[in-house]
């Protein structure tokens, strides 16, 4: 899925367009995910770090920590730790320089399987940058909020939208103000669903380790 803004309306708003393809800074939270970041867009190191702080804030408020691994900056490989198939607690986020959808106002895309699960999402930086200029928000916070929304879809699936919060199908002026202030987040129900999923995955890992007598990947 991805965000898009309605060009013909006078209000400042962002809307969410479902584009799910059929085919999450470390904190003190007990539950944690790792997000492998491929920055293939002209996003500076400092702007990316601030965006990661914002996305981590959103997830931390839901009781989930994020460990970021910056795999690529432009054409330069930053970390070799990304050269593996993502485990169950790992997700891959690519910041692409330009959009890859036919609708040029879509801001990103989460790739979901038929069961609503996924590991990969893309953000389209040129469109986010354009929206930032039009809406006069903070580019790092907007980038981080869009990242949190797309990662949220990887947790919550195709039917993840809510009337309020970061997973709302439409971001109107109040939501944009919350983005600018760094207060937009998941609902309580969404937080519980995401934590329950991680707890199930952890339980599977512990069971696997006890049966096999070795750590293994999960």
Where are these regions (language model features)?
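Metzincin-family zinc-dependent endopeptidase catalytic domain
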Residues: 45-154, 160
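Hydrophobic side chains within alpha-helical segments
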Residues: 14-16, 153-156
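Boundary at the C-terminal end of the N-terminal hydrophobic targeting segment
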Residues: 24-28
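Metalloprotease/metallohydrolase-associated module, dominated by Zn2+-dependent proteases
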Residues: 36-53, 113-137, 141-142, 158-218
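N-terminal secretory signal peptides that target proteins for export/translocation
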Residues: 1-8
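Bacterial N-terminal signal peptides
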Residues: 10-21
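Hydrophobic beta-strand segments of well-ordered beta-sheets in folded domains
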Residues: 29-36, 66, 89-92, 164
């Amino acid at each position: 899925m991805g965000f898009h803004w309605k060009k013909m309306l006078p209000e400042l708003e962002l809307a969410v367009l479902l584009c799910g393809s059929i085919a999450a800074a470390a904190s003190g939270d007990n539950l944690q995910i790792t997000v492998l970041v491929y920055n293939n867009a002209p996003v500076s190191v400092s702007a990316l770090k601030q965006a990661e702080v914002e996305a981590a804030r959103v997830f931390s408020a839901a009781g989930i920590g994020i460990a970021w691994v910056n795999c690529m900056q432009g054409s330069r490989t930053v970390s070799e730790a990304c050269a593996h198939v993502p485990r169950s607690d790992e997700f891959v986020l690519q910041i692409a320089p330009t959009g890859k959808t036919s609708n040029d106002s879509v801001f990103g895309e989460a790739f979901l399987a038929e069961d609503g699960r996924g590991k990969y999402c893309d953000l389209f930086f040129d469109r986010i940058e354009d929206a930032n200029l039009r809406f006069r928000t903070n580019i790092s916070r907007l980038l981080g909020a869009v990242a949190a929304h797309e990662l949220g879809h990887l947790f919550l699936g195709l039917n993840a939208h809510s009337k309020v919060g970061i997973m709302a199908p439409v971001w109107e002026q109040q939501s944009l103000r919350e983005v600018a202030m760094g207060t937009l987040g998941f609902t309580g129900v969404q937080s519980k669903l995401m934590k329950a999923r991680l707890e199930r995955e952890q339980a599977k890992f512990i069971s696997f380790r006890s049966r096999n007598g070795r750590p293994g990947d999960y």
